[in-house]
Amino acid sequence: MTLQEQIMKTLHVQSVIDPKTEIRKRIDFLKDYLRKTGAKGFVLGISGGQDSTLAGRLAQLAVEEIRNEGGSAKFIAVRLPYKVQKDEDDAQLALQFIKPDHSVSFDIAPAVDAFSNQYKDLLGESLTDFNKGNVKARVRMVTQYAIGGQQGLLVIGTDHAAEAVTGFFTKYGDGGADLLPLTGLTKRQGRALLQELGSDKRLYLKMPTADLLDEKPGQADETELGITYDQLDDYLEGKAVPQDVAKKIEKRYLASEHKRQVPASMFDDWWK
């Protein structure tokens, strides 16, 4: 088995999908896991990007089906901007499409800035822009878990195969969640699900960005990765890609294994 084939298997990627079937499977997963845990619903941060839009709509459909079947469940969508988000219009468009039971907005700037200032006072240096970006992601995680813990809700994560293969998420930030309904999907497959669900094109054709950096606001994921999502998707779907691209992907995959595992102990062998 080649490393490419091993990665596809490990990340549960299918070369070809049927969007309707995938939507059904993922809604059922959300419903089944919610019932198994006894939680009261879901909470998810909505950015206005493809991934949270898709996960949010699946979550809302899941809780609506549970209620129609005589159960009780709710979904809270959370806006988590740092000050004013330049693409707030996209976030509002996403919320209109998702139609969540409840929507709230938390400005994470006061918490992030207070921590950053205290860090500088105590340690005599400023956080790098990169590390401050990770603080933003982790404050967003803390906010979602505060809501979830208070109201008995599960935190949904938006990780998918193209992020998982590169480790392109913040450990214990956007990587911190209770369940991952987009697991196994490539970026283009996620777009196909949104198309099937009737999303506005603007939401799934939007340039993907983590938007965590103050010095490079709105920087494209592809710029930071040095790999395009089309290349990642081709690789993950078992297609041939240029050798240098395959090497970049595989290097990132191997280097980010710790992000896909629970914290290492001396009894584990995955890190050896």
Swiss-Prot record:
Superkingdom in the source lineage: Bacteria
Binding residue positions for deamido-NAD(+): 138, 171, 178, 258-259
Gene Ontology biological process terms, A to Z: NAD biosynthetic process
Residues annotated for Mg(2+) binding in this entry: 51, 163
Keywords carried by this UniProt record: ATP-binding, Ligase, Magnesium, Metal-binding, NAD, Nucleotide-binding
Reactions this protein catalyses: deamido-NAD(+) + NH4(+) + ATP = AMP + diphosphate + NAD(+) + H(+)
Pathway noted in the entry: Cofactor biosynthesis; NAD(+) biosynthesis; NAD(+) from deamido-NAD(+) (ammonia route): step 1/1
MF-aspect GO terms: ATP binding; glutaminase activity; metal ion binding; NAD+ synthase (glutamine-hydrolyzing) activity; NAD+ synthase activity
Binding site for ATP: 45-52, 158, 187, 209
GO cellular component, one term: cytoplasm
EC number per UniProt: 6.3.1.5
Family note: Belongs to the NAD synthetase family.
PANTHER family reported for this sequence: NH 3 /GLUTAMINE-DEPENDENT NAD + SYNTHETASE, NH(3)-DEPENDENT NAD(+) SYNTHETASE
Function: Catalyzes the ATP-dependent amidation of deamido-NAD to form NAD. Uses ammonia as a nitrogen source.
Stored NCBIfam families: nadE, PRK00768.1
Assembly with partners or alone: Homodimer.
Protein's recorded name: NH(3)-dependent NAD(+) synthetase
Species assigned in the record: Bacillus cytotoxicus (strain DSM 22905 / CIP 110041 / 391-98 / NVH 391-98)
UniProt lineage: Bacteria, Bacillati, Bacillota, Bacilli, Bacillales
UniProt gene name: nadE
